[in-house]
C-alpha cells in the first residue's frame, strides 16, 4: 500500500506546484522584459557623441579658466575624487577647478578610450594630458568618469583621475 500511496502523493504535489506556476509572470520577469526593451532602445553611439561633445566643452572652458562653467558639468550629487585631496562635492567643485587653473595648468586634453553603460549610467575611461605655458606637458594620467543621465542630459556623477608619472623623490 505504501508503494502506491508514496508515488501518488509526490505526483500530486508536483502537478499542483507546476499548475500554480504556469502562465504567471513574476515581478522579476516583468522587470527583465522592461529592462531589455529599454536596453534595446538605448543607443551607446549617441551617448558617446554626447559625452565627446561635453568633453570638448569642458576642455574649452578649462582653457578659458572658467571654473564655474566646469562645475556646471556635474550632477547635483556629483563629486571629484582628485589625488591627495578630500572628495569635492557640488559646492566645492568650482573652487577645486579654480585651484587647478591657478596652479599654472593652461590646458587640459581628454581622450576617451572606452565607454560602457546603459540609459541611466555610463562609465567612461580615458587618458588626460595637462599643459603649462608654451604647450609644455606637465602631467599625463588616466581617468574614470561615471556619467549620470539627469533629465535627458549626461552629467558627471563621479570623476576620479591620477597621474601615470612616476612618484617624485
What residue ranges belong to the model's regions?
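A solvent-exposed, acidic/Ser-Thr-rich amphipathic alpha-helical stretch
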Residues: 49-50, 67-118
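Sec-dependent N-terminal signal peptides
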Residues: 5-13
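A short hydrophobic beta-strand element
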Residues: 120-128
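Short beta-strand edge/turn micro-motifs at domain boundaries
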Residues: 25-26, 142-165
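Short, low-complexity N-terminal intrinsically disordered segments enriched in polar/charged residues
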Residues: 19-68, 72, 168
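Positively charged n-region of N-terminal signal peptides that target proteins for export
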Residues: 1-4, 20
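Hydrophobic/aromatic beta-strand elements that line small-molecule binding cavities or substrate pockets
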Residues: 97, 110-115, 128-130, 142-148, ...
Amino acid at each position: 500500500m505504501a508503494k502506491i500511496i508514496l508515488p501518488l502523493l509526490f505526483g500530486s504535489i508536483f502537478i499542483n506546484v507546476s499548475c500554480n506556476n504556469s502562465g504567471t509572470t513574476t515581478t522579476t520577469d516583468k522587470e527583465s522584459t522592461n529592462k531589455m526593451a529599454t536596453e534595446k532602445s538605448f543607443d551607446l553611439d549617441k551617448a558617446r557623441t554626447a559625452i565627446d561633445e561635453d568633453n570638448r566643452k569642458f576642455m574649452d572652458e578649462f582653457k578659458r579658466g572658467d571654473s564655474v562653467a566646469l562645475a556646471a558639468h556635474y550632477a547635483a550629487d556629483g563629486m571629484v575624487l582628485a589625488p591627495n585631496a578630500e572628495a569635492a562635492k557640488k559646492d566645492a567643485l568650482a573652487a577645486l577647478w579654480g585651484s587647478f587653473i591657478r596652479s599654472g595648468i593652461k590646458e587640459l586634453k581628454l581622450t576617451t578610450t572606452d565607454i560602457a553603460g546603459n540609459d541611466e549610467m555610463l562609465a567612461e575611461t580615458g587618458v588626460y594630458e595637462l599643459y603649462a605655458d608654451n604647450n609644455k606637458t606637465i602631467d599625463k594620467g588616466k581617468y574614470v568618469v561615471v556619467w549620470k543621465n539627469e533629465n535627458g542630459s549626461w552629467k558627471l556623477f563621479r570623476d576620479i583621475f591620477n597621474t601615470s608619472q612616476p612618484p617624485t623623490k
